[in-house]
Every structure is written in structure tokens, then in C-alpha cells.
A protein has these predicted regions:
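Conserved catalytic cores of very large enzyme subunits
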Residues: 1-259, 279-280, 284-321
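Contiguous, well-ordered alpha-helical segments that form the cores/surfaces of helical PPI scaffolds
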Residues: 262-275, 296
Length: 321
């Protein structure tokens, strides 16, 4: 393992090797500090914004990978400038049994450290790779490229994994666009209806209309996005997006970006339930079941839109931070 150790008491080749490791760890730490600094200062996004960046880690058990993870966490824990919390990149810890979750797992020590860092800096967030919907049938513990079969998220909420048009993976893909539905407003518009079941029926009717509009808006935006040519994105279309290596400079990017996702977001579920029932999902089992019905409607409609428009529609909970 690449860990910085005091050289006192070491001699010969052992001292030389540890000196080299100490120098390497110091350089890696500086690199992680620089990475975090750059991600919070490079204004290269549209409208001169800081790039919304995210990084998923935690399952690399090699000495080099563990060193990078440890120094990334250390830099995050110490903060930037005078100790402030860096907003970017959004950091996501990939939790996996046999890798970093149980005390006997090789990266368990880093998982414990990640929990400590998260308690202080709110990062990293955590994704459970053991959840049934996050498992990949091709994942094997001894596979050096198992990361290809591990779910990753963009930011703290946008899951990119299933793919109707290619391999199920997060590698080489991303979210193209997303629109959020304010379901609180829909619920408030129904509050004047005194009969509970009729109030809920009206809410779902309004929700269905808005879901249709949202899906159409995302489709039409994609129709514009797909007209771009590969030469307009020399970095993305040279080595990053899956399938981009097959494109010629004058080719449109449609076949490549359609492997990404179009996100339909929702916001305000708890407040929505209060407006409809008087209680939120943590206060009443009936409200909890209604909340599940609402999100299920989002997912069912997303599946329907995926068939109709031939895209990867996804559902996400918009944090609105």
C-alpha cells in the first residue's frame, strides 16, 4: 500500500523504497488538491459557469487506486482555502460488499474514512452497488475492469446505467437534458377539492398532462441536439462518449448521444403529500403509499415515453440545492 511513513529507523533498500513512496504520496496529494481547485475555478460551462462535475470512486483495491482515493478524501476533509467546503466535484462513494463495506473487505478502512469525511464535508454521497437494481450480471470481483459494470451517478441524483441502445454501463454515457416538475404546485391547485379521492384523481390527471408535455419538450430538445456534428466536440467525440470513435468529423452525433438519458425530475414530494392528505410520507402509512404511487406513475410514464420516442427516459429526484 502507498502510505506515507516516517523514515526514522529504516535503512538500505527499505529506506529508499519508502522515500520514493512518500514522495509519490505527496505528489498524489498535491494533484488531488489541484483537481479540486480546478473543478471549482474553471468557468468553461455555458454562461461562464463552473463545470458541474462529479466523480465516483471507492472500489479500486489496487495500491495506486487506494492511494488516489485516500488523498482525495484527505484533501476533501481538510477543505480548500481557509478550510472551506468545496462544492465540486460532487463525490460519490460506491459501496460494495466484498470490496469496501465489511471489516474484512480490502477497502473497508477507506469506507470508514469516507464516512468521517462525509460527516464533516457532506461529501462523498453514497451509492449502494448491492441494491438489486444496481447489480450487473457481468460484475466479477477478480475482473480488473469490473468498474464497467458498476453503477455511477452524475451529481448526487442522476443515475445512468440501463441502456436501450447498447451496453448497460455508466462508462461513456451521460444525461443529455432534464426538466423538473413541481408537483407541489399541482397538489396546491387541487386543494380546493373537498373529497379526498377526487382530489387525488385530479392531481394525477394534471400530472399526466405535465408528464406528456415534459417528455415532448425533452424529445424536441434532443431533435435539436442531435443535429450537431462530431467535429464540434473534439474531446467528447474522440475518446469519451461510447461509440464516438466510429463517427467521422461531419457525422451527426445522434447515434452516440441517444445512448445517454433524458431526465424527468420531480420536486417537493413531502409537501405535495401534505397538500393532498394533510400529512407527509414519514407521518402516515397512507401518505407513504400515495407517494409511492406518484413516483411509480413517473417511472411507468418514463417507460412509455422511452418506447414512443425511442430514448432513454429516466426519473430523478431534483434536490434544488
Amino acid at each position: 500500500d502507498y502510505v506515507r511513513i516516517v523514515l526514522d529507523g529504516l535503512s538500505g533498500d527499505e529506506r529508499v523504497l519508502q522515500h520514493a513512496i512518500n514522495r509519490t504520496v505527496s505528489r498524489v496529494h498535491q494533484s488531488m488538491e489541484a483537481f479540486i481547485h480546478n473543478m471549482n475555478t474553471i468557468h468553461s460551462r455555458g454562461g461562464n459557469q463552473v463545470v458541474f462535475s462529479s466523480v465516483n470512486y471507492g472500489t479500486d483495491t489496487s495500491a495506486e487506486g487506494r492511494c488516489i482515493i485516500r488523498e482525495m478524501l484527505t484533501s476533501t476533509y481538510r477543505g480548500v482555502g481557509s478550510g472551506g467546503t468545496a462544492i465540486f466535484p460532487i463525490q460519490i462513494w460506491k459501496k460494495k460488499r466484498g470490496v469496501n463495506y465489511l471489516p474484512q473487505d480490502p477497502n473497508y478502512d477507506l469506507y470508514v474514512f469516507a464516512c468521517k469525511v462525509s460527516a464533516r464535508r457532506f461529501f462523498p454521497n453514497f451509492i449502494n452497488l448491492d441494491a438489486t437494481f444496481n447489480r450487473h450480471e457481468l460484475w466479477k470481483a477478480g475482473d480488473p475492469e469490473r468498474f464497467r459494470y458498476e453503477t455511477a451517478t452524475m451529481g448526487c441524483r442522476t443515475r445512468v446505467f440501463e441502456n436501450r441502445f447498447g451496453e448497460k454501463t455508466s462508462i461513456g454515457r451521460g444525461n443529455l437534458s432534464f426538466s423538473t416538475i413541481n408537483i407541489v404546485r399541482l397538489a396546491i391547485e387541487c386543494m380546493d377539492i373537498s373529497e379526498r379521492e377526487e382530489r387525488i384523481r385530479t392531481f394525477f390527471s394534471k400530472l399526466d398532462e405535465l408528464l406528456e408535455l415534459t417528455a415532448l419538450q425533452l424529445h424536441r430538445r434532443f431533435e435539436f441536439q442531435k443535429t450537431a456534428r462530431a467535429k464540434q466536440f473534439p474531446l467528447l467525440m474522440s475518446s469519451l462518449w461510447v461509440g464516438a470513435e466510429k463517427l467521422k468529423p461531419e457525422d451527426t452525433i445522434e447515434s452516440v448521444i441517444n445512448q445517454g438519458t433524458l431526465g424527468i425530475g420531480f420536486i417537493g414530494l413531502a409537501e405535495c403529500l401534505v397538500a393532498l392528505t394533510g400529512k407527509h410520507h414519514a407521518e402516515d402509512p397512507a401518505a407513504q403509499q400515495l407517494g409511492i404511487r406518484i413516483i411509480t406513475r413517473f417511472r411507468d410514464k418514463a417507460n412509455e415515453f422511452s418506447e414512443r420516442w425511442q430514448h432513454n427516459y429516466s426519473v430523478l429526484a431534483t434536490p434544488a440545492e
